[in-house]
Amino acid sequence: MNYAYPDEKGHYGIYGGRYVPETLMQSVLELEEAYKEAMQDEAFQKELNHYLKTYIGRETPLYYAENMTKYCGGAKIYLKREDLNHTGAHKINNTIGQALLAVRMGKKKVVAETGAGQHGVATATVCALLGLECVIFMGEEDVRRQKLNVFRMELLGAKVESVAAGSGTLKDAVNEALRYWVSHVHDTHYIMGSVLGPHPFPQIVRDFQSVIGNETKKQYEALEGKLPEAVVACIGGGSNAMGMFYPFVHDEEVALYGVEAAGKGVHTEKHAATLTKGSVGVLHGSMMYLLQNEEGQIQEAHSISAGLDYPGVGPEHSLLKDIGRVSYHSITDEEALEAFQLLTKKEGIIPALESSHAVAYALKLAPQMKKDEGLVICLSGRGDKDVESIKRYMEEV
């Protein structure tokens, strides 16, 4: 398969690009240049690998979920344990890379958006480590849902700005963070939390997250002497999935499955299934599939999981859908909750609600596969942050 994206203008087929105001164009080009140089610099790579290993705790295990495998009665199920990273999710793979880039570019301050708070915590963490000032924008609805993560960020020295505009969720936090970056661009780096935004952000985030798929490939081959038949990951903006899928894109014998949030159901208005139900448009500097109405107004995304309710999806996922290399599906709140409880009871591993969507789809897929086949789930994060809201949800039902 001939796959070489993005092109030099940052496009993935028709998707991606740089839809930014003139005031930002210079910074975006400067970032691209700095990133290219850093990727060629052995000293930068060495420093990044040092932190990945000694600070974040990589590599993360590829765990054979024997009880889940028996329960499903099909393919062997493996979990890529991104929940075991420092801060409890895959997000820090990207934030450490971008923070080191910010230091290299001479920036003193970092701005970021966050939904569930995981990216905010991972950003505040690396800023504390590297002595950078940190400002995090978070929708007020998410601030309410994720009080503990807000406190955590503040403990780490970050300033958390609550965003009341719009629906007070991730989309609105991104708007404010971009606005802040425009006016502080001389001394501030924007750490985008997913494979979104204007080029080079989707590429930078994908490349820093690719450590997930690269490790998985190596670990699976060491265990089974071949590549897995199927790989499953959840999708909000799509960074854990892109990090898992990208190293497998050329291996056409490996089926790739992306799992979106169907919320209350894709037949309702309450979902975040952008690739299933969306249409093409531009948001936050990039062309991608979006949830929008006939007039092109962005619709609110809904999911029980704060990390999946973004109304767009990364431009590279948009392309991978169109060319059929990745198969995209959606899982409802109910199905994700069931999978959350099942994995917890069967394996003693509490997954994040985001990751539970991938687990739920894998539960449908595994029984259809042969017993000598392998299925890897990207367990993108741990569920500590969700226990309180799940308790509330279960009491209401």
Curated annotation (Swiss-Prot):
Gene3D superfamilies: 3.40.50.1100. CDD domains: Trp-synth_B. One of its GO terms (molecular function) is tryptophan synthase activity. It is an enzyme of class 4 (lyase). The modification N6-(pyridoxal phosphate)lysine is found at residue 91. Keywords: Amino-acid biosynthesis, Aromatic amino acid biosynthesis, Lyase, Pyridoxal phosphate, Tryptophan biosynthesis. One of its GO terms (biological process) is L-tryptophan biosynthetic process. Its cofactor is pyridoxal 5'-phosphate. One of its GO terms (cellular component) is cytoplasm. The beta subunit is responsible for the synthesis of L-tryptophan from indole and L-serine. Tetramer of two alpha and two beta chains. HAMAP family: Trp_synth_beta (MF_00133). This is Tryptophan synthase beta chain. It comes from Bacillus cereus (strain ATCC 14579 / DSM 31 / CCUG 7414 / JCM 2152 / NBRC 15305 / NCIMB 9373 / NCTC 2599 / NRRL B-3711). The lineage of its organism: Bacteria, Bacillati, Bacillota, Bacilli, Bacillales.
